[in-house]
């Protein structure tokens, strides 16, 4: 519970502008881990130089961060939020679990840079994301997806 509270202390700036923060998260994910861009068919034709400020990337990034906000505010009681997300990401999008670990680290960096998240907050976010990803992976296994 303390980890969720530690992260939520820094969530305000992100919540105030999901679109720009989300665009930054996905753009950085695609630049640092180019293989992840292939998992998003609607973004495969976008050149790296054109990613920053791309409306579609920013919109999807906002969706990602809004969902993360829901998970954070649930403070661990997130089964009802996570199950449909696990279902779509396993059965429809086929997103390997490792990609959630990659984006988690990008989110930590963006939170540090843009929301002033300190070392304690960064560790708390890593702890929260590890717990969420473990639960996501358990859902994947139930669905028979070994991503």
From Swiss-Prot:
Monomeric heme protein which primary function is to store oxygen and facilitate its diffusion within muscle tissues. Reversibly binds oxygen through a pentacoordinated heme iron and enables its timely and efficient release as needed during periods of heightened demand. Depending on the oxidative conditions of tissues and cells, and in addition to its ability to bind oxygen, it also has a nitrite reductase activity whereby it regulates the production of bioactive nitric oxide. Monomeric. Gene3D superfamilies: 6.10.140.2100, 6.10.140.2110. Pfam families: Globin (PF00042). Heme b binds at residue 89. It comes from Sarda chiliensis. Keywords: Cytoplasm, Heme, Iron, Metal-binding, Muscle protein, Oxidoreductase, Oxygen transport, Transport. PROSITE patterns: GLOBIN. This is Myoglobin. One of its GO terms (molecular function) is heme binding. One of its GO terms (cellular component) is extracellular exosome. Nitrite binds at residue 60. The keyword Oxidoreductase applies. Its EC number is 1.7.-.-, 1.11.1.-. The lineage of its organism: Eukaryota, Metazoa, Chordata, Craniata, Vertebrata. Residues 2-141 form the Globin domain. Belongs to the globin family. It catalyses: Fe(III)-heme b-[protein] + nitric oxide + H2O = Fe(II)-heme b-[protein] + nitrite + 2 H(+); H2O2 + AH2 = A + 2 H2O. O2 binds at residue 60. It is found in: Cytoplasm, Sarcoplasm. One of its GO terms (biological process) is removal of superoxide radicals. Disulfide bonds: none annotated. It is an enzyme of class 1 (oxidoreductase).
